[in-house]
Amino acid sequence: MSRLLPSTTNQHPTSPSFDSVVILDYGSQYAQLIARRVRDAHVYCELVPYDTDWSALKHLSPKGIILSGGPASVYEPDAPQLPSWVLESGLPVLGICYGMQLLAHTLGGRVAPAQRREYGPAVVERVADHPIFAGLPARFDVWMSHGDRIDALPPGFEVLARSANAPYAAMARDHLIGLQFHPEVAHTPLGSVILRNFLFDVCGCAPTWTAESFVEQAIREIRERVGKDRVLLALSGGVDSSVAAALIHRAIGDQLTPVFVDTGLLREGEAETIREVFGRHFRMPLVAIDARQRFLVRLRGVSDPEQKRRLIGEEFVRVFEEIARSQGPFRFLAQGTLYPDVIESAAPGASRTAAKIKTHHNVGGLPQDLEFELLEPLRYLFKDEVRAIGRLLGLPEEIVQRQPFPGPGLAVRILGEVTEEALAIVRRADTIVREEVEAAGLSDGLWQFFAVLLPVHSTGVMGDQRTYARVIAIRAVTSTDAMTADWARLPHDLLARLANRIVNEVPGVNRVVYDITSKPPATIEWE
């Protein structure tokens, strides 16, 4: 068997039609937010480890560089440094927080511990004009998060703004700019204006990163890479794999064979919807495999969430290998991997400073003896970008607006061993949650809402009889890109209806709890 060969060409959707910037990640908790704000301005960007070599980036032809914040102090011996190519490139540079201090330190300024640390809201006052602050008032609110500060500017730099505790809240020398505050967070209300000023006025970028331009470029790159070979696609029916299927089918037609594997781990009615949309509506040569018993046997006795993910990923690939042998040859395996999947898995392409959170079965959970090359045309996209592309490709709204669903399915919404009984419980509870949230008209404002079966029993009283039954947790969150999420403040009467229906309509459940934890510290899924 050949080794796993990740996709290359179509992972980086770049061409002269896309202006781009590079974000060097120094470990900031806000690094992904910088990328989101840049994409919101319709400029393509990639977030890469701070020590990435220029040779790995020059294909992007970036028009600017952003240095993220980070937890280190620039004067420490082992602190992350500025790659020499950044200044040698002659490109505009925007340093944020640690990035600003790194610019100052590298170019001859002085950075020292602040006498008074700044964490939280602050007001900065402009003291000089610069394109980065075009259209901003003399004083504006920002978000600070730093324990060091610049005590002396590097030669040739001028101070642009100051705050009560930071005499150099912003600095610049021509196209080299530093901001001590964080323009990427919502607590800096005018931060998007500042970032757009950098992108458009300083870097000279054009807002050409759109769904239309991406689709045009992706189709061209898929055709170039695939040639006359055939592609096998893992179709789950979720937004990601559905958009990947529609995009690849638009590019190469029936060279694509979408495979839907009914693992028995899907939501109620999901298998029927997939067959209807892709088999009959899009007229794709859909191959449907009933593997429910196969996956249940593989998961028997397994409770560890990482082991579940790996076993499911391995079994998926074995199914695809069997299809490839019977209907092949296929050279490529296509997946709907997104940028947050890559970042959370700390897979190749994600920041080296990011700790591994969990294995996504379509990233780190794949066996290393995979017999295909991976084709992942959405690998550098966020969820909202994928939805926009799905609409452009003509996917029905019921697919485009479908809430995210984990690759391992309900297996990671059952804490503990996956059994037929547990699946029946969580599937029915999840259906009730979806029905009630949608009936309340709240689904469009939520990122995800679902039920989780907990590995505990609870004492209760039902029909004058003592019960000792299972517990369901309800999870509902708001988010824009899954990188951060807040628990949803659902109305109490809705929560009451959910609890009442679940304990009365789902056999084996006598208690319902509501998860009020945000991300971070928790992840959206429980496993």
UniProtKB/Swiss-Prot annotation:
Pathway: Purine metabolism; GMP biosynthesis; GMP from XMP (L-Gln route): step 1/1. Gene3D superfamilies: 3.30.300.10, 3.40.50.880, HUPs. InterPro entries: Class_I_gatase-like, GATASE, GMP_synth_C, GMP_synth_GATase, GMP_synthase, GMPS_ATP_PPase_dom, NAD/GMP_synthase, Rossmann-like_a/b/a_fold. The keyword Cell inner membrane does not apply. SUPFAM superfamilies: Adenine nucleotide alpha hydrolases-like, Class I glutamine amidotransferase-like, GMP synthetase C-terminal dimerisation domain. GO terms for molecular function: ATP binding; GMP synthase activity. Pfam families: GATase, GMP_synt_C, NAD_synthase. The active site is at C97 (nucleophile), H182, E184. Catalyzes the synthesis of GMP from XMP. Homodimer. This is GMP synthase [glutamine-hydrolyzing].
